[in-house]
Amino acid sequence: MSGRSVRAETRSRAKDDIKRVMAAIEKVRKWEKKWVTVGDTSLRIYKWVPVTEPKSDDNKNKKKGKDDKYGSEVTTPENSSSPGMMDMHDDNSNQSSIADSSPLKQETSNNTSPAPEPMAASQNDSSDLKNDQYPSKQPSSGQDHKSEQNHCSSESMTSKRDSKSQGDSESFLDSSKSAQELEDGAPPSKKGKIDSSSEES
């Protein structure tokens, strides 16, 4: 009798392990690696971000995305506890994607962060706005002018991102900010120094 009970126990443990593995695979399918900016700085890192799945049933597109993700390393982020939280858009955290390399995601998702073309337009608009605000101030060199454009474009991106994230839940925003600060490794004091140096120039 003891042999049968041991086998049954092993079988039930194996079933639990299979369930755990399948849940981990489902989590990985909803995340992908992308280039994102860190806060208001120009620092870009390649990290795992949640995939926003469209509500329309594009099974072919989803299968292509799954095949692409298996080539990279398999990790599950520690701040993803339920599938409902993973479906939220990654703009809730203080990051935005700059170079979205997958055209598949641009076609399928409606509320992704701006693609490179709108960003280029926003940089031109922000530089025109900067020139209109300060017509008497002429930059002494090309580098000063470029730094002003970069600073202004980062401010416009931040304001767009803030307006998008106001409609989403506040608790997820706080948890994702703290998780990103841990992942990025850049302390808030360093970010403050970068912001103050860009304001001085």
Swiss-Prot record:
Domain of life from the UniProt record: Eukaryota
InterPro entries noted in UniProt: BCL7
Signal sequence bounds: none
One matching Pfam family: BCL_N
Record field: compositional bias (Basic and acidic residues): 54-71, 158-167, 192-201
Region (Disordered): 46-201
Polar residues bias locations: 73-83, 93-114, 133-142, 168-179
PANTHER family with a match to the protein in the record: B-CELL CLL_LYMPHOMA 7 PROTEIN FAMILY MEMBER A, BCL7 RELATED
The family this protein is said to belong to: Belongs to the BCL7 family.
Record protein name field: B-cell CLL/lymphoma 7 protein family member A
Record organism: Danio rerio (Zebrafish)
